[in-house]
């Protein structure tokens, strides 16, 4: 009989179908789960025989529905999945091949583009080996290879980025940087269990971001960032403020599996806009400070120290409220 199911405040229809279970075999005749232009259709046989197969058709299924099943929630994926999954010999030696398209594929709410994903089941891993091409037409391309394993509760992905949107980093560095905008080129490995992910690689970035405690925006026009397990290292990275004044940044951002951030940055500026705040109730001072010299930021565990040795430049204003 037709059945209605509510999933995330959306009413889905389960159409009449026939499912039979007999001696460890499952026979599915046209199971259809749909809502408007979204559907999941399953048809075929789940048995030990290599000659028996099952096909799963998807159209506009939200990617986060799928990943909720494996409790992969430290990284947020988005997009609409359309494609086919072919299964054989599921009850003995599973064989799976899939070809999926993800429309408006997002990572941490940052658009990466249209994703074309090919996958095969790996029995040893208990997961899927995948090869994905992700592209924003005329803007960027990202190539991802590796595996995702529910059995191991982890993943290991090699990512080759060509002008890839790096806004996906924002959740990992909340409270230090905000309003991240830019593109990245290079190679990165994302690996670890779903709850304890890590990164390594080397990239060149073109980006701008705000350092929250200083309320200043800095731009990297094209420079390298070194990524190793637990650390992002900045070595003589040239930065610019929004008025074109320049400086150099040295330092690091340390993390424990993308959590518990600790950082140390030395910003050496040449008439660089180092501080730009307005009168507010939580601080006894405010102002706009152009400086030549050094500002050192140290922080972590919800604490921060700022140490400055500067010669102030023209157009500097600073007010201490008594």
Kindly give the residue locations of the regions a language model identified:
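Interface amphipathic segments
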Residues: 1-187, 194-322
């Amino acid at each position: 009989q037709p059945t209605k199911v509510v999933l995330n405040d959306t009413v889905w229809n389960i159409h009449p179908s026939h499912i039979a279970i007999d001696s460890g075999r499952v026979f599915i005749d046209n199971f259809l789960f749909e809502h408007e232009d979204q559907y999941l259709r399953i048809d075929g046989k789940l048995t030990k025989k290599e000659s028996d197969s099952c096909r799963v058709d998807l159209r506009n299924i939200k990617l986060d529905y799928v990943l909720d099943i494996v409790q992969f929630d430290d990284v947020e994926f988005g997009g609409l999945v359309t494609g086919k999954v072919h299964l054989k010999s599921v009850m003995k030696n599973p064989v799976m091949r899939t070809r999926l398209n993800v429309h408006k594929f997002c990572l941490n709410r940052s658009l990466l583009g249209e994703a074309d994903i090919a996958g095969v089941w790996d029995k040893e891993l208990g997961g899927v080996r995948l090869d994905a091409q992700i592209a924003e037409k005329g803007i960027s391309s990202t190539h991802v290879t590796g595996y995702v394993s529910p059995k191991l509760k982890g993943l290991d992905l090699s990512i080759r980025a060509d002008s890839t949107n790096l806004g996906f980093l924002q959740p990992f560095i909340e409270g230090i940087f905000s309003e991240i905008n830019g593109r990245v080129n290079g190679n990165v490995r994302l690996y670890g269990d779903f709850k304890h992910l890590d990164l390594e690689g080397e990239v060149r970035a073109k980006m701008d971001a705000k350092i929250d405690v200083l309320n200043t925006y800095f731009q990297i026009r094209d420079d390298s960032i070194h990524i190793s397990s637990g650390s992002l290292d900045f070595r003589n990275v040239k930065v610019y403020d929004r008025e074109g004044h320049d400086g150099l940044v040295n330092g690091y951002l340390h993390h424990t599996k993308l959590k518990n951030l600790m950082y140390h940055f030395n910003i050496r500026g040449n008439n660089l806009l180092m501080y730009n705040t307005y009168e507010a109730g939580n601080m006894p001072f405010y102002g706009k400070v152009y400086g030549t010299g050094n500002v050192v930021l140290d922080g972590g565990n919800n604490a921060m120290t700022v140490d400055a040795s500067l010669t102030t430049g023209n157009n500097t204003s600073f007010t201490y409220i008594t």
